[in-house]
């Protein structure tokens, strides 16, 4: 009887929207009550889809928001109702077999279930070992107590892992924010020439932050869920251990399986000593280099090419572009002229028309899209010795060549003097070029006896510098397109 009354009362204080006991109940003037959250959400939905019309979800009578009032009386009833425990009849159902209606007195060892005497005689449990619940209660009490201690230990580990992952997440955030600040500060002085480097580095850090924090956030969520799972499991076991024998053994198979199947998952971490460490560029060196390039450009001279009968290079009418003929055709047509196809390289060189005998001189050469070239300065051709290539046309400073070159599209090198064992072969030294130049600047300081090469594409970084050059006679700009038919172009000072 009392149970039926409680059911009726519960129906009266149930929210018509969420069908749960009212939470912070609000009443409309029509008399219907709703959870504050439910009626608020309904109000917003009505405003969105029904052009501002507000009506009771139950009786559809219109209402105004200012007429909604908190219902303290209903709230008190709900609070009291939540405190009401199960009736004796409802509690009695737990002690009886759901299938046979008999009292649950036995425990099946194989299935780890509490059963009645009719269950024991059924086909399902035939041949199983059954005991009175009191006979196995102590055994399972010990098992669950041991499991509880193990779970508490794992719970502590889970909480520590959760705390560690939170700390690591915060640490990563601070570290990356610090790096971002450093990047911004380091690039401040060279904003005009380092914008792209700054942007690139910041994008890398943003990507690193996004990837790592996303992974750590995912791990954090997993650790929170794992910790919550542990808490619920511990709470369940504590409740069983503090309750009756029936509560201890009811569903014990399921909880034991959960414990046996449970493994403590550890979060994915990112060791800081393995991360990509940001290295700020040598800003002072870059600034000095930029200033040096700005300084040498004051000595820019308008260089043009000087056609001659020695070179087989193709010079354009504007005398600024030089390209190579097809080497195979030239070799077949004039095979007697060259000792080998390899010597073809020396016969495609061309000089600039300007003779340098003193002072400072600078010019730039466009080498974009070329896979091979040689450029620098030369002490001049010797037409009478044209065929004596080994002595007069190999690229060594002692023979009057201060040049650098490219071959196979990626191999940059400088030509130095050969050894005493190979006097007629230059010593080719590889150059480290991070950004391939589309334009190369050449600067000659005749009095200082230096020839410098700048990567204009990379903010004027110095590619190489010849020192202590022996300028015993006039030198000329030198260009050689090698066997690549794409032209080299002398840039005008206005470009």
Curated annotation (Swiss-Prot):
Required for interaction with GABARAP and for autophagy: region residues: 187-200
One of the Pfam families matching this protein, by short name: zf-B_box
UniProt pathway annotation: Protein modification; protein ubiquitination
Renumbered zinc finger spans (B box-type): 92-133
Domain named B30.2/SPRY: residues: 283-495
Catalyzed reaction equations: S-ubiquitinyl-[E2 ubiquitin-conjugating enzyme]-L-cysteine + [acceptor protein]-L-lysine = [E2 ubiquitin-conjugating enzyme]-L-cysteine + N(6)-ubiquitinyl-[acceptor protein]-L-lysine
InterPro entries xrefs: B30.2/SPRY (IPR001870), B30.2/SPRY_sf (IPR043136), Butyrophylin_SPRY (IPR003879), ConA-like_dom_sf (IPR013320), SPRY_dom (IPR003877), TRIM/RBCC (IPR050143), Znf-RING_euk (IPR027370), Znf_B-box (IPR000315)
GO molecular function annotation: pattern recognition receptor activity; ubiquitin-protein transferase activity; zinc ion binding
Cellular localization per UniProt: Cytoplasm; Nucleus
Phosphoserine modification, residue list: 87
Enzyme kind, highest EC tier: transferase
Record-listed N-acetylalanine modification sites: 2
Coiled-coil features, chain-numbered ranges: 137-225
UniProt keyword annotations, A-Z: Acetylation, Antiviral defense, Autophagy, Coiled coil, Cytoplasm, Immunity, Innate immunity, Metal-binding, Nucleus, Phosphoprotein, Transferase, Ubl conjugation, Ubl conjugation pathway, Zinc, Zinc-finger
PROSITE patterns hit by this protein: B302_SPRY, ZF_BBOX, ZF_RING_1, ZF_RING_2
Biological process according to GO: activation of innate immune response; autophagy; defense response to virus; innate immune response; positive regulation of canonical NF-kappaB signal transduction; positive regulation of MAPK cascade; positive regulation of NF-kappaB transcription factor activity; protein K63-linked ubiquitination
Gene3D superfamilies referenced in this protein's UniProt entry, alphabetically: 2.60.120.920, Classic Zinc Finger, Zinc/RING finger domain, C3HC4 (zinc finger)
Domain statement: The B box-type zinc finger domain and the coiled-coil domain contribute to the higher and low order multimerization respectively which is essential for restriction activity. The coiled coil domain is important for higher order multimerization by promoting the initial dimerization.
Description of how the protein assembles with itself and partners: Can form homodimers and homotrimers. In addition to lower-order dimerization, also exhibits a higher-order multimerization and both low- and high-order multimerizations are essential for its restriction activity. Interacts with BTBD1 and BTBD2. Interacts with PSMC4, PSMC5, PSMD7 and HSPA8/HSC70. Interacts (via B30.2/SPRY domain) with HSPA1A/B. Interacts with PSMC2, MAP3K7/TAK1, TAB2 and TAB3. Interacts with SQSTM1. Interacts with TRIM6 and TRIM34. Interacts with ULK1 (phosphorylated form), GABARAP, GABARAPL1, GABARAPL2, MAP1LC3A, MAP1LC3C and BECN1.
Protein known as: Tripartite motif-containing protein 5
Organism this protein belongs to: Colobus guereza
């Amino acid at each position: 009887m009392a149970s039926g009354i409680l059911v009726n009362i519960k129906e009266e204080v149930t929210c018509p929207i969420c069908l749960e006991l009212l939470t912070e109940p609000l009443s409309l003037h029509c008399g219907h009550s709703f959870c504050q959250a439910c009626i608020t959400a309904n109000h917003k939905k009505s405003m969105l889809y029904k052009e501002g019309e507000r009506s009771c979800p139950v009786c559809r009578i219109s209402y105004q928001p200012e007429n909604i009032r908190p219902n303290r009386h209903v709230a008190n009833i709900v609070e009291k109702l939540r405190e009401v425990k199960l009736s004796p009849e409802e509690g009695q159902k737990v002690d009886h077999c759901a299938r046979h209606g008999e009292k649950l007195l036995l425990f099946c060892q194989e299935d780890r279930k509490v059963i009645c005497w009719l269950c024991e005689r059924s086909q399902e449990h035939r041949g199983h070992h059954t005991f009175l619940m009191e006979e196995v209660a102590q055994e399972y009490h010990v098992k669950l107590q041991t499991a509880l201690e193990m779970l508490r230990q794992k719970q502590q580990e889970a909480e520590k892992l959760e705390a560690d992952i939170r700390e690591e997440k915060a640490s990563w955030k601070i570290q990356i924010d610090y790096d971002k600040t450093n990047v911004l500060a380091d690039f401040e002085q060279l904003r005009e020439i380092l914008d792209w480097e700054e942007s690139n580095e910041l994008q890398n850090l943003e990507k690193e932050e996004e990837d790592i924090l996303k992974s750590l956030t995912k791990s954090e969520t997993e650790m929170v869920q794992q910790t919550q799972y542990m808490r619920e499991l511990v709470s369940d076991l504590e409740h069983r251990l503090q309750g009756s024998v029936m509560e201890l053994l009811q569903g014990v198979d399921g909880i034991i399986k959960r414990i046996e199947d449970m493994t403590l998952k550890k979060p994915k971490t990112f060791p800081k000593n393995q991360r990509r460490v940001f290295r700020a560029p040598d800003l002072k060196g870059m600034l000095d280099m930029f200033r040096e390039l700005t300084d040498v450009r004051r000595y820019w001279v308008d260089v043009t090419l000087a056609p001659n009968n020695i070179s087989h290079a193709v010079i354009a009418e504007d005398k600024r572009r030089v390209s190579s003929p097809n080497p195979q055709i030239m070799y077949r047509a004039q095979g007697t002229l060259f000792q080998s196809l390899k010597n073809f390289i020396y016969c495609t060189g061309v000089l600039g028309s300007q003779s340098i005998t003193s002072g400072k001189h600078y010019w730039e050469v466009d080498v974009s899209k070329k896979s091979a070239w040689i450029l620098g300065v030369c002490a001049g051709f010797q037409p009478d010795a044209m065929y004596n290539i080994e002595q007069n046309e190999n690229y060594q400073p002692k023979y009057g060549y201060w040049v650098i070159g490219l071959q196979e599209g990626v191999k940059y090198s400088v030509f130095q003097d050969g050894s005493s064992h190979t006097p007629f072969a230059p010593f080719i030294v590889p150059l480290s070029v991070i950004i391939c130049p589309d334009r190369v600047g050449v600067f000659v300081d005749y009095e200082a006896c230096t020839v410098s090469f700048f990567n204009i594409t990379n903010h004027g970084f110095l590619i190489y510098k010849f020192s202590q050059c022996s300028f015993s006679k006039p030198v000329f700009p030198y260009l050689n397109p090698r066997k690549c038919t794409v032209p080299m172009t002398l840039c005008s000072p206005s470009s």
